[in-house]
């Protein structure tokens, strides 16, 4: 793919630093080098040179490296200027470069987009760059790196190859209608289809783990005032993140903590106690609490174990349960076991899991951690995983649907054309993951979320 514009941007993070890098990509990279550093550096060699304005005034000095396309990150000619990391110096240099006719400032993610368009990496690898930059844990970074190195892509390519081979076999049989009945009962087709379905299920399970690693889980702690919600937040966070007093209604706004459980990102949200209140500020806090509940992956329904022996939230607070979004997972937390005499532990033999604990003494907190991991299906012991996004899971689910539909058609001995079409659709959805078949709108959405200079 030929890009008419040459683009430039700061590749290092904004702000002050020891080193700042300007990246230029496009057919005018050589021209930029001649105008700014006075020569075209030897390919892939670091050259220590002055950086000058178009008028010849020295702005900085540093290292210039030239990469000739297609042997560069973007597949185009690329120039990198590595100078001092002061924002003023970098801004002056970038302004001079953008004055050159045919050169403009890059849009967010445009370098990675060009790398994708020029077949230097596929879409999962491009997305992995952003995921690696945004990783919030060591395990998330490792998973993103695996995707960047093509681990996810290899799984998808293997699946696509097997689907293509089966399509060829099916469509060849369709061309010989006299043999089609024998083909439909051929054990090879059924066996190959079962093998593809099994492999797709394995990849989907791994992708779900990767999605959890990237997205994390939103957990809202909700309940009446003074039930110990903030104490639970502090115990899970391992620090005094929220003010705790004996006064009901101490928490009036939403408090957020971002923690990790064995590498799984967890967004814990403490909310104002839910009750009817004449206080305007508290009312606003309660409205925000419900906003968070409506966006949650799970709610920890906190209750004071000294107030009731019930564990069924529908009996304890039917109005609260009736207002929850349909399908939202709920765990009942019976707090203050140190005062109520409850045995610290977990009971999963009821409609809603019940955990008895003492948030104040941090007794039973590990039960909550393990429970949240189990709720989302996270396996912290998984090694060699890759990062995945919601769109990847959607594509895998669509592919699985069409494979299952094709299998049903085969078992009912319907005409092979229908099976062939289901296999074609399966291949299409799998190709969307790596970008072999992707709409321009989706590409724009993906790359616009990247950093400028990436």
Curated annotation (Swiss-Prot):
GO cellular component annotations of the record: cytosol
Entry coiled-coil feature ranges: none
Binding site for GTP: 226-231, 245-251, 270-273, 335-338
Residues the record lists as binding K(+): 226, 245, 247, 250
Localization per Swiss-Prot or TrEMBL: Cytoplasm
Cofactor(s) the record lists: K(+)
Gene Ontology biological process terms in this record: tRNA methylation; tRNA wobble uridine modification
PANTHER family: TRNA MODIFICATION GTPASE GTPBP3 (PTHR42714), TRNA MODIFICATION GTPASE GTPBP3, MITOCHONDRIAL (PTHR42714:SF2)
Oligomer and partners: Homodimer. Heterotetramer of two MnmE and two MnmG subunits.
Protein name, entry field: tRNA modification GTPase MnmE
Organism: Pseudoalteromonas translucida (strain TAC 125)
Lineage per the UniProt record: Bacteria, Pseudomonadati, Pseudomonadota, Gammaproteobacteria, Alteromonadales
Gene encoding the protein: mnmE
